Curated annotation (Swiss-Prot):
NCBIfam families xrefs: reco (TIGR00613)
InterPro entries the UniProt entry points to: ARFGAP/RecO (IPR037278), DNA_rep/recomb_RecO_N (IPR022572), NA-bd_OB-fold (IPR012340), RecO (IPR003717), RecO_C (IPR042242)
BP term (GO), one: DNA recombination
Gene Ontology cellular component annotations, sorted alphabetically: bacterial nucleoid
Claim: DNA damage is one of the keywords in the record: yes
Name under which the protein is recorded: DNA repair protein RecO
Function as written in the Swiss-Prot or TrEMBL entry: Involved in DNA repair and RecF pathway recombination.
Family: Belongs to the RecO family.
Top-level lineage group: Bacteria
């Protein structure tokens, strides 16, 4: 079945196909993720809008049994500030790849599309891209079938405690129940507290967010542990972020 639709869409990536053609993966608001064929991409009027992290309203010809086609576009947003900063772009690429990994092709998920779009808009507006990524990661865990409770102790259900996390129980422990898991994570209590807050944050009302570098580093390390334990995906974009830690500081110092 072939149908024509108009939908908001975010380009996830493109890849070469034959000599001058491209296959373009777009996450659309109306019909989920689809692969689109662009013939003679280098000379095509579509060339400016088939680059990664371009958001536009596309006129699309959808083929449920094969490749789909882009017929036209308007209302283009290119996120210039994201694309001008290697570090922000790396994190933006990662959250887009994470959304891609969490959703099957051809499966509509308008709330996820809106969440990803808003995340990129807040990065573009200058909010802390590392913290935005942490919030995106913790909220998208449910798309992978993972539900974690950072609000209460798994044993006594008390709230507002100096919690630690236990992979043994997949939940938090209060100080009175630390002994239940000798291999508990020994987290800074601020980490479970922040993740509990992050699970409830609504990006539509978020105006500012700021955390100290040390806390952000601890969050990053624990999020990596959570994803390794419960999700088990290894995205190239995440590996690139990890590599930035090795040489990224040198680039920042050169800009001073």
């Amino acid at each position: 079945m072939i149908q024509s639709i108009t939908s908001q869409g975010l380009v996830l990536y493109n890849r070469n196909f034959r000599e001058d053609d491209k296959l373009v993966k777009i996450f659309t608001e109306q019909v989920g993720k689809r692969m689109f064929f662009v013939k003679h991409a280098g000379q095509s009027k579509l060339a400016p809008v088939i680059q990664p992290l371009v958001l536009a309203r596309f006129l699309l010809r959808i083929n449920d049994d094969g490749l789909s086609y882009i017929e036209d576009y308007h209302e283009v947003m290119t996120f210039p500030k994201i694309n001008s900063d290697l570090f922000v772009m790396a994190y933006a690429t990662y959250v887009a790849a994470l959304a891609d990994a969490s959703l099957q092709d051809n499966q509509q998920d308008a709330p996820l599309f809106a969440f990803l779009q808003k995340t990129l808009e807040l990065m573009e507006a200058g909010l802390d891209y590392q913290v935005l990524t942490n919030i995106f990661e913790i909220q998208i865990l449910t798309r992978f079938g993972i539900s974690l409770n950072f609000n209460e102790c798994v044993f006594c259900h008390r709230v507002g405690q100096a919690f630690d996390f236990s992979f043994k129980y997949g939940a938090c422990l209060c100080p009175e129940h630390y002994h239940e898991d000798k291999r508990r994570c020994h987290l800074n209590p601020n980490i479970p507290y922040l993740l509990n807050q992050f699970q409830a944050i609504d990006f539509e009302t978020l105006e500012t967010i700021s955390l100290k570098p040390g806390i952000k580093q601890e969050l990053r390390q624990f999020m990596d542990q959570l994803y390794e334990e419960y999700v088990g995906i290894h995205l190239k974009s995440k590996k690139f972020i990890d590599s930035l830690a090795d040489w990224g500081q040198l680039l920042k110092e050169e800009k001073k």
